[in-house]
Amino acid sequence: VHCMALLPHAREGEALPKRQTLYLLHGYGDSYTSWIRKTNLERYAAHHNLAVIMPDAQKSAYTDMTHGGKFFTYIADELPGKMRAFLPLSERREDTFIAGFSMGGYGAFKIGLARPMQYAAIGCISAGVSNDTPDTVALRELRTGGRPLKDTEEDVPASIARAAALGKDAPRIYHTIGQEDFLLSGARETRDLLCSYPGDPFHYIYEEKPGKHGWEFCDGALRDFLQWLSPAPR
């Protein structure tokens, strides 16, 4: 499986530290190279002194596929350890984040909430817990072979409920979508679900801004997410 890593340069006179790390997930029809090619990620990450790991997940919806790779297990359980073995990445939960665009935003919810003690924050751009479109419904049988996800680790609403029970230890969530996005209704349903838990355990931020479903909106949303994540450069 392909994966791309972006590491900030060590500053002059600085010993090579273990970096804060963002796992950044691509959308349907994109790949592990899309973030570098289609956004200003490299400049944003350098500003925040942040390492970024971008795995490829094909069109899996970050699922353990019946007819394909086990992408949920790979990214949730295998990839972090492998990356830390090769690269100077922090092992601390407070230094580890996950985010994504479109299908990757759904994947960030799925993985981040299934492993809430692994990530301090989750970012979802242009997506929601349900991203059903004719294309994704048609692919579901290929991904799951009819296997129900309810009450499994990949049941996102159930993962939300379990993570919310952590109270102040639940990961923070930043969620944004364009007002002209075709996935807007699913994002609003997700907003309503996350806001239904008393006490705001996720310190949930939801923003709708002018824009459609595409990289122009995504680039600005990525910049805003990283600013929310780390307001001051490190």
Segments predicted by a language model, with ranges:
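Non-catalytic cap/lid and distal C-terminal segments of serine-dependent acyl enzymes
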Residues: 1-234
